[in-house]
Amino acid sequence: MLRVSNLSKFYEIKKHWYLKSKKYFIFENINFSLKQNENLMIEGKSGAGKSTLARILCFLENPSGGEVWYKGDNLHQLDKKRQRLLRKEIQYCFQDQKMALNPYKKIKNLIQDGLENFNFKKNGDLIDEFFDFFNLKKQILEQKPYELSGGEATRVGLIRSLILNPSLLILDEIVSTLDIKNSKEILNFLYHYQQKNFISYIFITHQSELFYNFKYEKIKL
């Protein structure tokens, strides 16, 4: 499904105007593949490029070299229209959902906007199903992100991604800001969701001990 070949990211920086620019690599020649319904864990120290790699995989940033192939398409050679169509298949859940969600909109509108952006019809029944699955109270739909707890905001972020029925969900330090109880609950939800749906996860984390329910391959940056 996904194949990453010799992927590199660097920035060219000049320390002084009279010096030649020098390449500073975030990562270099990364290779891995991921089959449908399998998982991958990406580990590495802070600043190793984990989030940069995630952003490249979902078109938010371009690589400096190498290729990303998804279901036979070289992603960064596609035009913007085709990339946009694929965004519903490759979803990215940011680390801090309270910061990622638009603070001026109600949760109901944030979820419905996501559906409309990809030409899905508004579906209150489907939203209710996801709220039941993630054990969220329906009154949250009328609240705004700043009114939610960290665990509630993370669940809402996951619903916004999963309601599009993606094939691949990239989870960037999804439980790093949560307590152990909320972390285990959310990972348990994700585990059971995968048992019922044909989805692959890429976990970016430094807390691998919490992911004991999942089978996954691992790479380290």
Predicted features and spans:
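Conserved ABC ATPase signature
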Residues: 144-148, 152
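Conserved ABC transporter NBD signature motif
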Residues: 66-75
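Hydrophobic anchor residue at the start of the ABC signature
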Residues: 157-158
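Conserved catalytic motifs of ABC-family nucleotide-binding domains
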Residues: 165
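Helix-to-loop junction immediately C-terminal to a conserved catalytic motif
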Residues: 58
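Q-loop/switch helix immediately C-terminal to the Walker
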Residues: 96, 103-119
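ABC ATPase NBD coupling module
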Residues: 19-20, 75-91, 117
